[in-house]
Amino acid sequence: DSVPILLSFMIVAFGAQEKDAGVILSVAALLGTLAGLGTKGCSQRFGFLRTLCLITGAYGVGYAANTFSQNIWFSGFFFVIAMMGYGVFHNAAFSYLTVRTERSMLGKVLGDFTAIGDIGRIPITAFAGFLAAWSFAGIPGWRIVCALFGAVACCITLYLLWTWLRNGDAGGSPCEERKKPQSLLPPLSLLRDRHTASTVVANILDGFSGDQIFAFLPFLLFAKGMDPKVIGSFALAFTVGCFAGKMACGRLVGIFGSRKVFITSKLLMSALLAVLVTAQGLPVIIVTSILLGIVTKGTVPVLQTLLVEPVTDPQAYDDLFAFNTFARGSTNILTPLLFGFIASAFSAEYIYVLMAIVSVFAVAPVLFGRPMRA
């Protein structure tokens, strides 16, 4: 999550344009999605511990190299390397936890795992935003952030490598315990089920309307003439909202049902995006950012619940989640490129107007989809 923030400061420092950020983020999403497809083979070949070494090594190289960047495309190349590692990490971790967790406990384990990730992102992302806006001894803050993040990732890589050399890959491959080989890609026949198809379409529209809110908001704030130092305040507010949203919306599903929670969240998101575009005062933007974080990331567990509610075969979960994730990831390949050109040709405000409109349309597949089966 720190990449879009750092990239926005690099755009300003190098005199580049918003569309350059869109190209970089689109390429990163494309290669990250493709890298994620190779997670299973990577884990089987190298084992879980060595796979983590490769992932953290990609983080370290990507950030450390950008400490010395002199142009936006150099920065983009090495950020793509870091984000490819990010694309592999969650698939490898989820696979590892799924294989080694009882089905009845899987939801709790994965929920705790994602919550821990959010706890880490909140202070780290805010730290990156605050520090990147300053300079120290003539060194831009974003270079210092890249150096710190790169050093930490490289140290973790060396520790994991030392652990593997000393103990071997005690965790083994996260996929080695499966009895039958499975295809890397889920079958397209999943879309024959109307409920599955409507949920996947809703997921695509949800991703279009919400996944790039964080990435392009620095440009929106710049367009409003705000001090770059407020980016850190926004980052903190938005990530706190994301953490709260995952927990709050997940619990509301048990009370009101996943359909009602999703529809309400998307309509609220549309209204909040309209407020964000028109707001001028920092307090209003901060409050709106928190609420946007809640309804943006809160819809992710809601859609996952909606997707599997009518499914009785636990073996189908892997294919359903993989297809849903791939569909959303494919959307994220295109949206940064589209939004970057919109921001350059018109202004960042038009991006958020488009997001608000699509957020309303995301309700339709869920509203008119087949009623949930028992």
PLM regions with names:
Residues 1-22, 29, 198, 202, ...:
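Helix-loop boundary and gating motifs at the non-cytosolic
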Residues 113-164:
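Helix-loop-helix hairpin linking two adjacent transmembrane segments in secondary transporters
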Residues 1, 29-37, 122, 239-243, ...:
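Residue-level signature of mid-helix packing/kink "hotspots" within the transmembrane helices
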Residues 80-117:
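Cytoplasmic helix-loop-helix junction between adjacent transmembrane helices
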Residues 88-101, 298-312:
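Intracellular juxtamembrane helix-capping segments at the cytosolic ends
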Residues 50-64, 260-274:
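Structural signature of the two symmetry-related core transmembrane helices
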Residues 35-47, 245-257, 343:
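Helix-to-loop junctions at the C-terminal end of transmembrane segments
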Residues 167-199:
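Juxtamembrane intracellular "pre-TM" segments in multi-pass secondary transporters
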